[in-house]
Regions:
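Hot-dog-fold acyl-thioester-processing enzymes
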Residues: 1-91
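HotDog/MaoC-like acyl-thioester-processing domains
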Residues: 1-3, 96-153
Length: 153
C-alpha cells in the first residue's frame, strides 16, 4: 500500500519540553571536545552552582534532536511503522538566538513543513519539520530550525 504523506504538510506536532540537565551536559562533555567547557565535578555548591552556567554551543543540536523526538508519534504523525520500516535522520539546520543554560527548561514547538519523495538505491519520503525552541520561563527564542527524517518505502 502506497502512503501519500504530502497530506501531512502543515500539520502541527505536539508541544514538548526538555530540561538542560547537568547530567546530560556532563555526559555530552565526556565524548565531545569543548576546550572552553568542563564537566561540573559537584564541588562549589553542586547542582545549585551548576544551574545557570552556559551549556556548550555544540549541545544545542542534541537538545533539538531529543526535543523533536518528543513532538511526534511515528505512526500517528508520519504514517510510518518504525517497527517494520527503516527511518534515518536527514539534514538539520539550526539558527541560534542565545545560549542554553544548565538547569533551563525549554519548550519545543514543531510542524511538518514539507514532504517529498527521493530516489537513491531505494525510494524514500523526506519529511521536513520546522521548529522553535523557547525558554519556558521567559518565552524568549533560543533556537529555530529544520530537521528532516527519511522514511524508506
Amino acid at each position: 500500500m502506497t502512503v501519500d504523506r504530502t497530506v501531512l504538510i502543515g500539520r502541527p506536532l505536539r508541544a514538548a519540553t526538555y530540561t538542560v540537565s547537568e547530567i546530560d551536559v556532563n555526559d555530552f562533555l565526556g565524548v565531545v571536545a569543548e576546550p572552553d567547557f568542563a564537566p561540573a565535578d559537584g564541588s562549589e555548591g553542586g547542582a545549585e552552582a551548576a544551574s545557570g552556567r552556559l551549556a556548550p554551543p555544540s549541545f544545542a543540536p542534541f537538545v533539538a534532536v531529543l526535543g523533536l523526538l518528543k513532538t511526534f508519534d511515528w505512526q500517528e504523525d508520519f504514517l510510518f511503522d518504525y517497527r517494520t520500516g527503516t527511518a534515518m535522520f536527514g539534514e538539520q539546520a539550526i539558527e541560534f538566538h542565545r545560549p542554553l543554560l544548565v538547569g533551563e527548561s525549554v519548550a519545543i514547538s514543531a510542524a511538518i513543513s514539507d514532504v517529498y519523495e527521493k530516489q537513491g538505491k531505494q525510494t524514500f519520503d523526506v519529511i521536513e519539520v520546522t521548529f522553535d525552541i523557547k525558554s519556558r520561563e521567559e518565552g524568549d527564542l533560543l533556537m529555530s530550525g529544520q530537521q528532516s527524517y527519511n522514511l524508506f518505502k
